[in-house]
């Protein structure tokens, strides 16, 4: 059986991809618009969650 491990991004990496500040990323996480997990106290965001967030934003823009 093959297990696919999702690529996880740090908050600064998400900031760079979305071109937003740290507080905006945490706001998106807090409001559950951006999925995330904690690993030993460190916040990580799956790349799929960032992609899904961007797709949702594009859908709202149309």
Curated annotation (Swiss-Prot):
Q: Which Pfam families match?
A: HTH_17
- GO MF, one annotated term: DNA binding
Family matches, as InterPro entries? HTH_17, SinI_DNA-bd
- For this UniProt record, give its keywords in alphabetical order, as a comma-separated list: DNA recombination, DNA-binding, Plasmid, Viral genome excision
* Segments forming a coiled coil: none
Q: Which domain of life is it from?
A: Bacteria
Biological-process GO terms, alphabetical: DNA recombination; provirus excision
- This chain belongs to the protein called Excisionase
Native organism is Streptomyces ambofaciens
């Amino acid at each position: 059986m093959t297990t696919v491990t999702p690529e996880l991004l740090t908050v600064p990496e998400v900031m760079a991809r979305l071109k937003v500040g740290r507080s905006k990323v945490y706001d998106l996480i807090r409001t559950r618009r951006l999925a995330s997990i904690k690993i030993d106290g460190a916040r990580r965001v799956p790349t799929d969650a960032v992609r899904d967030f961007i797709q949702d934003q594009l859908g709202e823009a149309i």
